[in-house]
């Protein structure tokens, strides 16, 4: 097919990217404008390519409007952290910045296996980027129409294989980064050169839409590969990485009321040798760059390109561009996707402690000084921290002689909670209110008490030691990955959600809508009824989602492009 569509049809985002001078826009000038706390015009969108979103505190909107003040505009920054690995020294740097320079004082672990700062005012932005640079970090391409933070299976049980997978996650991230010098010029006072920027992979208008990549090590699907555009499934031989199965075209975002949008599982393309990894990654990205829909952003992601052009045609184009033929998919299987909490011994004789961080929000609470505790551990720990795609944190690489001291610190500060149930650990939410401008309903602030109510139901049916994969997302964009949950709540309005049921425990089946626009009480009543039936009628080891499908309570989504709305 032709590589270009008629220019008149392009969305306005294509115009602003093309006119941005390789993502510079007039961001530097806006930084000097003290009359507003935000960025104007195109810059509002362009700062996303630099890893930031412009937000405001929605709890304060009405009050500030009454006082004739503009909203409390602030920025959220998402760090680029391939595979979620961060050193204790880096952690201490971000800990201090969050405490001293942000409105909320917290560090937010996210489903993109990195951390976010929320509530950064415009005068603090340059110092924030320069701090990250000094720490060896950045936020390049963690938002916008680019390849975003690359996820990698984070549990280091198989340390050699995990290390190899993580090295490839870093290589893929670096290879697909924008080449523009705009970030360094604007935020790091980098030298402006006369050399014209080139973007050989992403192109002068970058990608049609955001693009997400994972490296996953079976049997753990902790990264939820089917939520991502490009996935490399590690294939090993005698514990050594030998290549990847490649899956393309996953994604969960949709638009309420628009049946041309839907979640989609990734399609299997085939197996590749390690040496072909970067060639295939580049070929998938450039094919999506040239074939993706640049006129309608709601249908611009890779999943829609595969449906419009055909999986076979897309796959063949990737082979041509890469000069690589896909071999048949090699056997792989997933058995779980949750994090393995507590101490796990690696094959290197070091120990790894996975901590449950509810909602990923690291802050000092009256009964749990999580932020202080992690800072104290960082001052003592000789290994690293690994953030997980489930919003939790691993203290990795602990010597046996240091285990007791690390655990004592974690317990003292409430980082280890023996009372946290399997259900609570299997539940997750996106940020939503008060900072996300897209949120239609609560998610992070709603989840803890909602889970308590679900726990009561589970206990009443003799299910206290069981779990249901439960996800809450504040809008249909899907950051909480509700469209791969056994129970998925998608915000519709304040206090109301669409309820999806019937996903599976390992993240390989999309749930189906069960009730639309219902209240918390209605949702809990449905969970009470279906969990009770599950307890009475399930087969040995049968999960909640699998039971719902077998019992005919929901029909499975088999081919979401065709049957998601049936």
Swiss-Prot record:
Binding site for [4Fe-4S] cluster: 430, 436, 475, 479
Obligatory cofactor(s): siroheme; [4Fe-4S] cluster
Protein name as it appears in the record: Sulfite reductase [NADPH] hemoprotein beta-component
Cofactor note: Binds 1 siroheme per subunit. Binds 1 [4Fe-4S] cluster per subunit.
Function field: Component of the sulfite reductase complex that catalyzes the 6-electron reduction of sulfite to sulfide. This is one of several activities required for the biosynthesis of L-cysteine from sulfate.
Gene Ontology MF terms: 4 iron, 4 sulfur cluster binding; heme binding; metal ion binding; NADP binding; sulfite reductase (ferredoxin) activity; sulfite reductase (NADPH) activity
Binding positions (siroheme): 479
Alphabetized UniProt keyword annotations: 4Fe-4S, Amino-acid biosynthesis, Cysteine biosynthesis, Heme, Iron, Iron-sulfur, Metal-binding, NADP, Oxidoreductase
Gene name tied to this protein: cysI
Cellular component annotations (GO), alphabetically ordered: sulfite reductase complex (NADPH)
Biological processes, Gene Ontology terms: cysteine biosynthetic process; hydrogen sulfide biosynthetic process; sulfate assimilation
Pfam families attached to this UniProt entry: NIR_SIR, NIR_SIR_ferr
InterPro entries named in the record: CysI, NiRdtase/SiRdtase_haem-b_fer, Nit/Sulf_reduc_fer-like_dom_sf, NO2/SO3_Rdtase_4Fe4S_dom, NO2/SO3_Rdtase_4Fe4S_prot, NO2/SO3_Rdtase_4Fe4S_sf, NO2/SO3_Rdtase_FeS/sirohaem_BS
Self-association and partners: Alpha(8)-beta(8). The alpha component is a flavoprotein, the beta component is a hemoprotein.
Pathway the protein acts in: Sulfur metabolism; hydrogen sulfide biosynthesis; hydrogen sulfide from sulfite (NADPH route): step 1/1
Matching SUPFAM superfamilies: Nitrite and sulphite reductase 4Fe-4S domain-like, Nitrite/Sulfite reductase N-terminal domain-like
Catalytic activity as recorded in UniProt: hydrogen sulfide + 3 NADP(+) + 3 H2O = sulfite + 3 NADPH + 4 H(+)
Signal peptide positions (record): none
Family, as annotated: Belongs to the nitrite and sulfite reductase 4Fe-4S domain family.
EC number(s) reported in the record: 1.8.1.2
């Amino acid at each position: 097919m032709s590589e270009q569509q008629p220019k008149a049809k392009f969305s306005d985002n294509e115009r602003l990217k093309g006119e941005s001078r390789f993502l510079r826009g007039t961001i530097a000038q806006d930084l000097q404008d003290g009359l507003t706390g935000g960025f104007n015009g195109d810059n509002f969108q362009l700062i996303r390519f630099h890893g930031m979103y412009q937000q405001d505190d929605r709890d304060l909107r009405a009050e500030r409007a009454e006082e004739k003040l503009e909203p409390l505009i602030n920025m959220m920054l998402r760090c680029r952290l391939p595979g979620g690995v961060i050193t204790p020294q880096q952690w201490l740097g971000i800990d201090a910045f969050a405490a001293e320079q942000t409105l909320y004082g917290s560090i937010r672990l996210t489903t993109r296996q990195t951390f976010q700062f929320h509530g950064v005012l415009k005068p603090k932005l340059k110092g924030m980027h320069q701090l990250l640079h000094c720490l060896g970090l950045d936020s390049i391409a963690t938002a916008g129409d680019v390849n975003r933070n690359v996820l990698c299976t984070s549990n280091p049980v198989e340390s050699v294989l995990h290390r190899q997978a993580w090295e490839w996650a870093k290589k893929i991230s670096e290879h697909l980064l924008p080449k523009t010098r705009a970030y360094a010029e604007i935020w790091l006072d980098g030298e402006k050169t006369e050399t014209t920027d080139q973007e050989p992979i992403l192109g002068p208008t970058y990608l049609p839409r955001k693009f997400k990549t994972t490296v996953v090590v079976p049997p753990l699907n902790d990264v939820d590969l089917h939520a991502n555009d490009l996935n490399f499934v590690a294939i090993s031989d005698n514990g050594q990485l030998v290549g990847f199965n490649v899956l393309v075209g996953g994604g969960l975002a949709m638009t309420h009321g628009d049946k041309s949008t839907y979640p989609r599982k990734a399609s299997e393309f085939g197996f590749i040798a390690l040496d072909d990894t970067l060639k295939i990654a580049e070929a998938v990205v450039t094919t999506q760059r040239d074939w993706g829909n640049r006129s309608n952003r709601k249908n611009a992601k890779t999943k829609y390109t595969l449906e419009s052009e055909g999986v076979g045609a897309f796959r063949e184009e990737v082979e041509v561009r890469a000069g690589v033929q896909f071999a048949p998919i090699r056997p792989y299987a997933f058995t779980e996707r949750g994090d393995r909490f507590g101490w796990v011994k690696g094959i290197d004789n070091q120990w790894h402690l996975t901590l449950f961080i509810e909602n990923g929000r690291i802050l000092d609470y009256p009964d749990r000084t999580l932020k202080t505790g992690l800072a104290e551990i960082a001052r003592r720990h000789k290994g690293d921290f690994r953030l997980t795609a489930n919003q939790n944190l691993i203290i990795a690489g602990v010597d046996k002689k240091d285990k007791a001291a690390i655990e004592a610190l974690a317990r003292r500060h409430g980082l280890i909670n023996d009372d946290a149930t399997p259900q609570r650990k299997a539940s997750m939410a996106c940020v939503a209110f008060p900072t996300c401008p897209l949120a239609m309903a609560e998610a992070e602030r709603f989840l803890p008490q909602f889970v308590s109510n679900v726990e009561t139901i589970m206990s009443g049916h003799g299910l206290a030691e069981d779990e249901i994969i439960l996800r809450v997302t504040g809008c249909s964009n899907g950051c909480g990955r509700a469209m791969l949950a056994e129970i998925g709540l998608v915000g519709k309005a304040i206090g109301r959600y669409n309820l999806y049921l019937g996903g599976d425990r390992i993240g390989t089946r999309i749930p189906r809508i069960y009730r639309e626009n219902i209240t918390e009480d209605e949702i809990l009543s449905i969970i009470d009824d279906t969990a009770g039936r599950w307890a009475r009628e399930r087969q040995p080891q049968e999960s909640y989602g699998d039971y719902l499908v077998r019992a005919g309570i929901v029909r499975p989504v088999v081919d979401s492009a065709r049957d998601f709305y049936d």
